[in-house]
Amino acid sequence: MIRIPGYEHKRIAVMGLGVAGLPTVRALMASGAHVLAWDDGAESRNKAAAEGIPVVDLLSADWDGIDTLVLSPGIPHTFPKPHPVAERARKADAQIVCDVDLLGRAQPDAIYVGITGTNGKSTTTALIAHILASAGKTIEVGGNLGPPVLAFAPLGKNGIYVLEMSSYQLERTFSISFDVAVLLNVSPNHIDRHGDLAGYVAAKTRIFAGNRKKKTAVIGADDEETRRVADTLADRMHIVRVTREKPGPGMVGAEGTRLVDRTGDAPRIVLDLKDAPDLPGRHNAQNAAAAYAATRALGVAPEAIAAAMKTYRSLPHRLERVATVEGVTYVNDSKATSPEATVWALTSYDKVIWIAGGLSKEVGYDALIPYLPKIAHAFLIGKAAGEIAAFLGKHGIPATASETLERAVPAAHALATSAAGARVVLLSPACASFDQYHSFEKRGDDFRAHVKKLGAGA
Protein backbone atom coordinates (compact mmCIF):
# COMPACT_ATOMS: atom_id res chain seq x y z
CA MET A 1 0.00 0.00 0.00
CA ILE A 2 1.13 3.54 -0.80
CA ARG A 3 1.37 6.03 2.06
CA ILE A 4 1.19 9.71 1.16
CA PRO A 5 3.50 12.05 3.10
CA GLY A 6 2.08 15.30 4.41
CA TYR A 7 -1.52 14.10 4.68
CA GLU A 8 -1.66 13.54 8.42
CA HIS A 9 -4.78 15.23 9.86
CA LYS A 10 -5.76 16.67 6.45
CA ARG A 11 -9.45 16.55 5.53
CA ILE A 12 -9.84 14.80 2.16
CA ALA A 13 -13.09 14.01 0.34
CA VAL A 14 -13.39 10.81 -1.69
CA MET A 15 -16.33 10.32 -4.05
CA GLY A 16 -16.79 6.83 -5.48
CA LEU A 17 -16.02 3.71 -3.45
CA GLY A 18 -15.45 1.15 -6.17
CA VAL A 19 -12.35 -0.60 -7.48
CA ALA A 20 -10.11 2.47 -7.12
CA GLY A 21 -12.05 4.35 -4.45
CA LEU A 22 -11.71 1.90 -1.57
CA PRO A 23 -7.92 1.49 -1.95
CA THR A 24 -7.70 5.29 -2.11
CA VAL A 25 -9.53 5.65 1.20
CA ARG A 26 -7.39 2.93 2.80
CA ALA A 27 -4.17 4.63 1.67
CA LEU A 28 -5.33 8.04 2.89
CA MET A 29 -6.40 6.70 6.27
CA ALA A 30 -3.10 4.83 6.62
CA SER A 31 -1.41 8.19 5.90
CA GLY A 32 -3.25 9.79 8.81
CA ALA A 33 -5.77 11.75 6.76
CA HIS A 34 -9.29 12.49 7.97
CA VAL A 35 -11.37 11.04 5.13
CA LEU A 36 -14.95 11.88 4.22
CA ALA A 37 -16.11 9.14 1.84
CA TRP A 38 -19.28 8.81 -0.21
CA ASP A 39 -20.80 6.78 -3.02
CA ASP A 40 -24.20 7.11 -4.67
CA GLY A 41 -24.76 3.37 -4.25
CA ALA A 42 -26.00 2.09 -0.91
CA GLU A 43 -24.21 -1.25 -1.35
CA SER A 44 -20.83 0.46 -1.80
CA ARG A 45 -21.47 2.73 1.19
CA ASN A 46 -22.39 -0.24 3.38
CA LYS A 47 -19.26 -2.13 2.33
CA ALA A 48 -17.10 0.85 3.21
CA ALA A 49 -18.84 1.39 6.55
CA ALA A 50 -18.27 -2.27 7.42
CA GLU A 51 -14.53 -1.59 7.08
CA GLY A 52 -14.77 1.30 9.51
CA ILE A 53 -14.53 3.93 6.80
CA PRO A 54 -16.30 7.19 7.72
CA VAL A 55 -19.17 7.51 5.24
CA VAL A 56 -20.44 11.09 4.94
CA ASP A 57 -22.88 12.63 2.46
CA LEU A 58 -20.57 15.04 0.68
CA LEU A 59 -23.41 17.28 -0.46
CA SER A 60 -24.39 18.14 3.09
CA ALA A 61 -20.91 17.86 4.62
CA ASP A 62 -18.91 20.78 5.99
CA TRP A 63 -16.21 21.47 3.38
CA ASP A 64 -14.23 23.81 5.60
CA GLY A 65 -10.57 22.74 5.36
CA ILE A 66 -11.11 20.29 2.49
CA ASP A 67 -8.76 21.23 -0.34
CA THR A 68 -8.90 17.99 -2.37
CA LEU A 69 -11.68 15.83 -3.80
CA VAL A 70 -10.55 12.43 -5.09
CA LEU A 71 -13.21 11.68 -7.69
CA SER A 72 -13.62 8.26 -9.30
CA PRO A 73 -12.70 8.47 -13.01
CA GLY A 74 -16.13 7.24 -14.03
CA ILE A 75 -17.89 10.20 -12.40
CA PRO A 76 -18.08 13.36 -14.58
CA HIS A 77 -16.81 16.69 -13.30
CA THR A 78 -17.46 18.69 -16.49
CA PHE A 79 -19.35 17.10 -19.39
CA PRO A 80 -22.05 16.03 -20.02
CA LYS A 81 -23.10 17.39 -16.62
CA PRO A 82 -20.94 17.75 -13.52
CA HIS A 83 -21.81 15.48 -10.64
CA PRO A 84 -23.26 17.56 -7.76
CA VAL A 85 -20.32 16.63 -5.53
CA ALA A 86 -17.91 17.96 -8.17
CA GLU A 87 -19.86 21.22 -8.23
CA ARG A 88 -19.73 21.33 -4.43
CA ALA A 89 -15.95 20.87 -4.55
CA ARG A 90 -15.58 23.75 -6.99
CA LYS A 91 -17.58 26.04 -4.70
CA ALA A 92 -15.20 25.09 -1.90
CA ASP A 93 -12.21 25.76 -4.19
CA ALA A 94 -11.05 22.15 -3.74
CA GLN A 95 -8.86 20.57 -6.40
CA ILE A 96 -10.44 17.57 -8.17
CA VAL A 97 -7.98 14.72 -8.73
CA CYS A 98 -7.92 10.94 -9.15
CA ASP A 99 -5.94 8.26 -7.35
CA VAL A 100 -3.08 8.42 -9.88
CA ASP A 101 -2.40 11.99 -8.83
CA LEU A 102 -1.99 10.85 -5.23
CA LEU A 103 0.52 8.21 -6.36
CA GLY A 104 2.60 10.94 -7.97
CA ARG A 105 2.53 12.98 -4.76
CA ALA A 106 3.56 9.94 -2.72
CA GLN A 107 6.32 8.68 -5.04
CA PRO A 108 7.83 11.77 -6.69
CA ASP A 109 11.24 10.19 -7.31
CA ALA A 110 10.02 7.08 -9.14
CA ILE A 111 10.18 6.57 -12.90
CA TYR A 112 6.82 6.84 -14.64
CA VAL A 113 5.74 5.34 -17.96
CA GLY A 114 2.28 6.39 -19.16
CA ILE A 115 0.37 4.80 -22.01
CA THR A 116 -2.80 6.14 -23.60
CA GLY A 117 -4.74 5.99 -26.86
CA THR A 118 -8.19 5.06 -28.07
CA ASN A 119 -7.19 1.48 -28.90
CA GLY A 120 -4.33 -0.81 -27.92
CA LYS A 121 -3.31 0.83 -24.66
CA SER A 122 -3.96 -2.20 -22.45
CA THR A 123 -1.91 -4.54 -24.65
CA THR A 124 0.91 -2.01 -24.95
CA THR A 125 0.92 -1.41 -21.19
CA ALA A 126 1.07 -5.13 -20.46
CA LEU A 127 3.79 -5.66 -23.08
CA ILE A 128 5.96 -2.83 -21.72
CA ALA A 129 5.58 -4.24 -18.21
CA HIS A 130 6.50 -7.74 -19.42
CA ILE A 131 9.63 -6.46 -21.18
CA LEU A 132 10.76 -4.45 -18.16
CA ALA A 133 10.12 -7.32 -15.74
CA SER A 134 11.96 -9.73 -18.04
CA ALA A 135 14.90 -7.31 -18.03
CA GLY A 136 15.01 -7.42 -14.23
CA LYS A 137 13.52 -3.99 -13.56
CA THR A 138 11.50 -3.34 -10.41
CA ILE A 139 8.02 -2.40 -11.60
CA GLU A 140 4.36 -2.05 -10.76
CA VAL A 141 1.75 -2.04 -13.52
CA GLY A 142 -1.84 -0.84 -13.37
CA GLY A 143 -3.95 2.28 -13.55
CA ASN A 144 -6.85 1.99 -15.97
CA LEU A 145 -5.74 -1.59 -16.65
CA GLY A 146 -5.84 -2.45 -12.95
CA PRO A 147 -4.90 -3.01 -10.16
CA PRO A 148 -5.58 0.36 -8.48
CA VAL A 149 -2.41 2.39 -8.11
CA LEU A 150 -2.62 3.11 -4.38
CA ALA A 151 -2.52 -0.64 -3.74
CA PHE A 152 0.97 -0.69 -5.30
CA ALA A 153 4.17 -1.17 -3.36
CA PRO A 154 6.27 1.98 -2.86
CA LEU A 155 9.17 1.64 -5.31
CA GLY A 156 11.24 4.76 -4.70
CA LYS A 157 13.91 6.24 -6.93
CA ASN A 158 14.78 3.28 -9.17
CA GLY A 159 11.32 1.74 -9.40
CA ILE A 160 9.18 2.05 -12.51
CA TYR A 161 5.42 2.56 -12.47
CA VAL A 162 3.84 1.49 -15.78
CA LEU A 163 0.42 3.11 -15.98
CA GLU A 164 -2.35 2.74 -18.52
CA MET A 165 -4.03 6.14 -18.51
CA SER A 166 -7.57 6.81 -19.67
CA SER A 167 -8.64 10.27 -20.77
CA TYR A 168 -10.68 10.50 -17.56
CA GLN A 169 -7.59 9.86 -15.43
CA LEU A 170 -5.35 12.19 -17.42
CA GLU A 171 -7.62 15.19 -16.94
CA ARG A 172 -7.38 14.68 -13.15
CA THR A 173 -3.65 13.92 -12.82
CA PHE A 174 -1.37 16.89 -12.15
CA SER A 175 1.51 15.60 -10.03
CA ILE A 176 3.13 13.19 -12.52
CA SER A 177 5.45 14.14 -15.35
CA PHE A 178 5.88 10.89 -17.28
CA ASP A 179 9.48 10.01 -18.12
CA VAL A 180 8.17 8.04 -21.09
CA ALA A 181 4.76 9.02 -22.46
CA VAL A 182 3.05 6.90 -25.12
CA LEU A 183 0.14 8.06 -27.31
CA LEU A 184 -0.88 5.28 -29.70
CA ASN A 185 -3.82 6.68 -31.64
CA VAL A 186 -6.86 8.91 -31.37
CA SER A 187 -10.31 8.37 -32.82
CA PRO A 188 -13.66 9.79 -31.65
CA ASN A 189 -14.55 8.27 -28.27
CA HIS A 190 -16.11 9.41 -24.98
CA ILE A 191 -17.19 12.62 -26.70
CA ASP A 192 -20.02 13.02 -24.19
CA ARG A 193 -17.45 13.25 -21.37
CA HIS A 194 -15.16 15.74 -23.13
CA GLY A 195 -17.59 17.97 -25.01
CA ASP A 196 -16.14 17.37 -28.47
CA LEU A 197 -13.23 15.68 -30.24
CA ALA A 198 -10.94 18.60 -29.42
CA GLY A 199 -11.69 18.13 -25.72
CA TYR A 200 -10.96 14.40 -25.98
CA VAL A 201 -7.65 15.05 -27.76
CA ALA A 202 -6.74 17.69 -25.17
CA ALA A 203 -7.31 15.17 -22.38
CA LYS A 204 -5.21 12.52 -24.13
CA THR A 205 -2.31 14.89 -24.78
CA ARG A 206 -2.09 15.76 -21.09
CA ILE A 207 0.11 12.66 -20.92
CA PHE A 208 2.90 14.91 -22.24
CA ALA A 209 2.45 17.57 -19.55
CA GLY A 210 5.17 18.30 -17.02
CA ASN A 211 8.80 19.23 -17.06
CA ARG A 212 10.93 16.11 -16.78
CA LYS A 213 14.30 17.00 -18.31
CA LYS A 214 14.78 13.67 -20.10
CA LYS A 215 11.30 13.06 -21.40
CA THR A 216 10.60 10.70 -24.31
CA ALA A 217 7.33 10.86 -26.23
CA VAL A 218 6.35 7.78 -28.22
CA ILE A 219 3.61 8.75 -30.66
CA GLY A 220 1.69 6.73 -33.24
CA ALA A 221 2.05 7.95 -36.82
CA ASP A 222 -0.92 6.11 -38.31
CA ASP A 223 -3.66 8.67 -37.81
CA GLU A 224 -4.01 12.36 -38.50
CA GLU A 225 -4.65 13.50 -34.94
CA THR A 226 -1.53 11.88 -33.48
CA ARG A 227 0.64 13.13 -36.35
CA ARG A 228 -0.57 16.63 -35.55
CA VAL A 229 0.27 16.14 -31.87
CA ALA A 230 3.78 14.94 -32.74
CA ASP A 231 4.40 17.97 -34.94
CA THR A 232 3.24 20.27 -32.14
CA LEU A 233 5.58 18.70 -29.58
CA ALA A 234 8.62 18.27 -31.84
CA ASP A 235 10.52 21.28 -30.49
CA ARG A 236 9.77 20.50 -26.83
CA MET A 237 10.83 16.89 -26.28
CA HIS A 238 12.44 13.84 -27.83
CA ILE A 239 9.86 12.09 -30.02
CA VAL A 240 9.90 8.58 -31.45
CA ARG A 241 7.18 8.01 -34.03
CA VAL A 242 5.87 4.45 -34.34
CA THR A 243 3.79 2.82 -37.06
CA ARG A 244 2.26 -0.48 -38.07
CA GLU A 245 3.58 0.23 -41.58
CA LYS A 246 7.09 0.49 -43.02
CA PRO A 247 8.98 3.02 -40.88
CA GLY A 248 10.72 6.09 -42.21
CA PRO A 249 13.96 7.49 -40.81
CA GLY A 250 13.80 8.05 -37.06
CA MET A 251 10.80 5.72 -36.65
CA VAL A 252 10.02 2.21 -35.41
CA GLY A 253 7.58 0.10 -37.40
CA ALA A 254 6.93 -3.06 -39.36
CA GLU A 255 8.26 -4.23 -42.70
CA GLY A 256 5.97 -7.15 -43.39
CA THR A 257 6.12 -9.14 -40.18
CA ARG A 258 9.51 -7.79 -39.11
CA LEU A 259 9.78 -5.16 -36.39
CA VAL A 260 12.33 -2.60 -37.58
CA ASP A 261 14.09 0.17 -35.65
CA ARG A 262 15.20 3.09 -37.83
CA THR A 263 16.10 5.47 -35.02
CA GLY A 264 19.84 4.80 -35.38
CA ASP A 265 22.41 5.21 -38.13
CA ALA A 266 21.33 1.98 -39.82
CA PRO A 267 18.05 0.02 -39.74
CA ARG A 268 17.90 -2.74 -37.14
CA ILE A 269 15.65 -5.77 -37.53
CA VAL A 270 14.48 -6.40 -33.97
CA LEU A 271 12.56 -9.62 -34.53
CA ASP A 272 10.06 -11.34 -36.79
CA LEU A 273 6.69 -10.89 -35.11
CA LYS A 274 5.75 -14.37 -36.30
CA ASP A 275 7.94 -15.48 -33.39
CA ALA A 276 5.70 -13.51 -30.99
CA PRO A 277 2.49 -15.56 -31.36
CA ASP A 278 0.45 -13.47 -28.92
CA LEU A 279 1.03 -10.30 -30.94
CA PRO A 280 -0.87 -11.11 -34.14
CA GLY A 281 -2.13 -8.57 -36.67
CA ARG A 282 -1.16 -5.17 -37.98
CA HIS A 283 -2.48 -3.32 -34.94
CA ASN A 284 -0.16 -5.32 -32.69
CA ALA A 285 2.74 -4.32 -34.93
CA GLN A 286 2.19 -0.74 -33.78
CA ASN A 287 1.73 -1.86 -30.17
CA ALA A 288 5.03 -3.77 -30.39
CA ALA A 289 6.77 -0.78 -31.98
CA ALA A 290 5.55 1.48 -29.17
CA ALA A 291 6.62 -0.98 -26.47
CA TYR A 292 10.03 -1.31 -28.11
CA ALA A 293 10.55 2.46 -28.29
CA ALA A 294 9.40 2.96 -24.70
CA THR A 295 11.62 0.27 -23.22
CA ARG A 296 14.63 1.32 -25.31
CA ALA A 297 14.20 4.79 -23.80
CA LEU A 298 14.54 3.11 -20.39
CA GLY A 299 17.77 1.38 -21.37
CA VAL A 300 16.62 -2.14 -22.24
CA ALA A 301 18.75 -3.73 -24.98
CA PRO A 302 17.09 -4.62 -28.32
CA GLU A 303 17.98 -8.28 -27.90
CA ALA A 304 16.32 -8.40 -24.48
CA ILE A 305 13.20 -6.71 -25.86
CA ALA A 306 12.97 -9.23 -28.70
CA ALA A 307 13.35 -12.17 -26.32
CA ALA A 308 10.63 -10.81 -24.03
CA MET A 309 8.20 -10.23 -26.90
CA LYS A 310 8.50 -13.89 -27.84
CA THR A 311 7.34 -14.94 -24.37
CA TYR A 312 4.59 -12.32 -23.98
CA ARG A 313 1.13 -13.74 -23.33
CA SER A 314 -1.92 -11.75 -24.36
CA LEU A 315 -4.29 -10.14 -21.90
CA PRO A 316 -7.55 -11.94 -21.15
CA HIS A 317 -10.33 -11.22 -23.65
CA ARG A 318 -8.04 -9.40 -26.11
CA LEU A 319 -7.14 -11.80 -28.93
CA GLU A 320 -6.43 -14.31 -26.18
CA ARG A 321 -5.47 -17.75 -27.44
CA VAL A 322 -7.58 -19.99 -25.24
CA ALA A 323 -6.70 -23.46 -26.49
CA THR A 324 -6.09 -25.64 -29.51
CA VAL A 325 -8.52 -28.55 -29.70
CA GLU A 326 -8.20 -31.15 -32.47
CA GLY A 327 -6.09 -28.74 -34.49
CA VAL A 328 -8.54 -25.83 -34.10
CA THR A 329 -7.31 -22.67 -32.34
CA TYR A 330 -9.83 -20.81 -30.16
CA VAL A 331 -9.37 -17.06 -29.72
CA ASN A 332 -11.20 -14.97 -27.11
CA ASP A 333 -11.59 -11.35 -28.20
CA SER A 334 -14.63 -10.58 -26.06
CA LYS A 335 -13.25 -7.06 -25.45
CA ALA A 336 -14.19 -6.24 -29.07
CA THR A 337 -17.51 -4.57 -28.30
CA SER A 338 -17.78 -2.61 -31.56
CA PRO A 339 -17.42 -3.42 -35.27
CA GLU A 340 -14.29 -1.24 -35.41
CA ALA A 341 -12.65 -3.36 -32.71
CA THR A 342 -13.55 -6.55 -34.56
CA VAL A 343 -11.83 -5.21 -37.69
CA TRP A 344 -8.50 -5.51 -35.87
CA ALA A 345 -9.26 -9.10 -34.93
CA LEU A 346 -10.17 -10.09 -38.48
CA THR A 347 -6.98 -8.55 -39.86
CA SER A 348 -5.01 -10.88 -37.59
CA TYR A 349 -6.04 -14.12 -39.30
CA ASP A 350 -6.36 -15.44 -42.84
CA LYS A 351 -9.63 -17.33 -42.36
CA VAL A 352 -11.88 -17.71 -39.34
CA ILE A 353 -15.12 -19.12 -38.11
CA TRP A 354 -16.60 -16.07 -36.44
CA ILE A 355 -18.73 -15.99 -33.28
CA ALA A 356 -20.39 -12.59 -32.93
CA GLY A 357 -23.38 -10.79 -31.53
CA GLY A 358 -24.76 -9.38 -28.32
CA LEU A 359 -26.21 -5.94 -27.77
CA SER A 360 -25.72 -3.81 -30.87
CA LYS A 361 -23.94 -0.46 -30.61
CA GLU A 362 -26.30 0.67 -33.41
CA VAL A 363 -23.48 2.01 -35.56
CA GLY A 364 -23.89 -0.48 -38.40
CA TYR A 365 -21.39 -3.08 -39.57
CA ASP A 366 -20.05 -1.50 -42.74
CA ALA A 367 -16.58 -1.20 -41.20
CA LEU A 368 -16.34 -4.99 -41.56
CA ILE A 369 -17.04 -5.11 -45.31
CA PRO A 370 -13.40 -5.18 -46.52
CA TYR A 371 -12.68 -8.09 -44.17
CA LEU A 372 -15.72 -10.29 -44.78
CA PRO A 373 -13.81 -12.63 -47.15
CA LYS A 374 -11.88 -13.77 -44.07
CA ILE A 375 -15.08 -15.23 -42.56
CA ALA A 376 -15.82 -18.82 -43.57
CA HIS A 377 -18.99 -18.97 -41.48
CA ALA A 378 -20.54 -16.97 -38.65
CA PHE A 379 -22.34 -18.26 -35.57
CA LEU A 380 -24.43 -15.48 -34.06
CA ILE A 381 -25.59 -14.91 -30.50
CA GLY A 382 -27.64 -12.40 -28.55
CA LYS A 383 -30.11 -9.73 -29.57
CA ALA A 384 -28.08 -8.54 -32.55
CA ALA A 385 -27.98 -11.99 -34.19
CA GLY A 386 -30.74 -11.20 -36.69
CA GLU A 387 -29.28 -7.81 -37.58
CA ILE A 388 -25.82 -9.26 -38.20
CA ALA A 389 -27.24 -12.21 -40.15
CA ALA A 390 -29.07 -9.81 -42.48
CA PHE A 391 -25.88 -7.79 -42.98
CA LEU A 392 -23.81 -10.90 -43.72
CA GLY A 393 -26.48 -12.29 -46.04
CA LYS A 394 -26.25 -9.19 -48.25
CA HIS A 395 -22.58 -9.99 -48.73
CA GLY A 396 -22.88 -13.73 -49.26
CA ILE A 397 -21.41 -14.82 -45.90
CA PRO A 398 -23.13 -17.90 -44.44
CA ALA A 399 -24.38 -17.55 -40.89
CA THR A 400 -26.18 -19.59 -38.26
CA ALA A 401 -28.29 -18.12 -35.44
CA SER A 402 -27.03 -19.98 -32.37
CA GLU A 403 -28.50 -17.65 -29.72
CA THR A 404 -25.97 -18.60 -27.01
CA LEU A 405 -22.29 -19.45 -26.67
CA GLU A 406 -23.34 -22.81 -25.27
CA ARG A 407 -24.69 -23.63 -28.73
CA ALA A 408 -22.28 -21.61 -30.85
CA VAL A 409 -19.00 -23.09 -29.60
CA PRO A 410 -19.71 -26.79 -30.31
CA ALA A 411 -21.33 -25.90 -33.64
CA ALA A 412 -18.27 -23.90 -34.63
CA HIS A 413 -16.03 -26.77 -33.56
CA ALA A 414 -17.97 -29.26 -35.65
CA LEU A 415 -17.56 -27.07 -38.72
CA ALA A 416 -13.90 -26.26 -38.02
CA THR A 417 -12.96 -29.94 -37.79
CA SER A 418 -14.70 -30.78 -41.05
CA ALA A 419 -12.67 -31.05 -44.23
CA ALA A 420 -13.72 -27.57 -45.39
CA GLY A 421 -13.48 -25.83 -42.02
CA ALA A 422 -11.27 -22.88 -41.12
CA ARG A 423 -8.87 -23.72 -38.31
CA VAL A 424 -9.45 -20.64 -36.14
CA VAL A 425 -12.64 -20.00 -34.15
CA LEU A 426 -12.75 -16.33 -33.21
CA LEU A 427 -15.05 -14.83 -30.60
CA SER A 428 -15.01 -11.14 -31.51
CA PRO A 429 -18.58 -10.04 -30.86
CA ALA A 430 -18.62 -6.51 -32.37
CA CYS A 431 -21.34 -5.87 -29.76
CA ALA A 432 -21.72 -5.10 -26.09
CA SER A 433 -22.41 -7.99 -23.73
CA PHE A 434 -25.20 -6.62 -21.58
CA ASP A 435 -28.08 -8.54 -23.17
CA GLN A 436 -26.66 -11.82 -21.83
CA TYR A 437 -23.74 -10.96 -19.52
CA HIS A 438 -22.83 -8.35 -16.91
CA SER A 439 -19.55 -7.59 -18.69
CA PHE A 440 -17.39 -8.54 -21.64
CA GLU A 441 -15.16 -10.36 -19.12
CA LYS A 442 -18.03 -12.67 -18.11
CA ARG A 443 -18.76 -13.34 -21.78
CA GLY A 444 -15.13 -14.22 -22.41
CA ASP A 445 -15.03 -16.46 -19.35
CA ASP A 446 -18.10 -18.30 -20.62
CA PHE A 447 -16.44 -18.80 -24.01
CA ARG A 448 -13.38 -20.26 -22.27
CA ALA A 449 -15.55 -22.62 -20.26
CA HIS A 450 -17.28 -23.99 -23.36
CA VAL A 451 -13.96 -24.42 -25.16
CA LYS A 452 -12.66 -26.32 -22.13
CA LYS A 453 -15.62 -28.70 -22.46
CA LEU A 454 -14.55 -29.42 -26.04
CA GLY A 455 -11.09 -30.37 -24.83
CA ALA A 456 -12.53 -32.63 -22.15
CA GLY A 457 -14.50 -34.50 -24.77
CA ALA A 458 -11.75 -34.68 -27.38
Predicted segment positions?
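Short internal beta-strands
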Residues: A33-D40, A217-A221, I355-A356, P373-A384
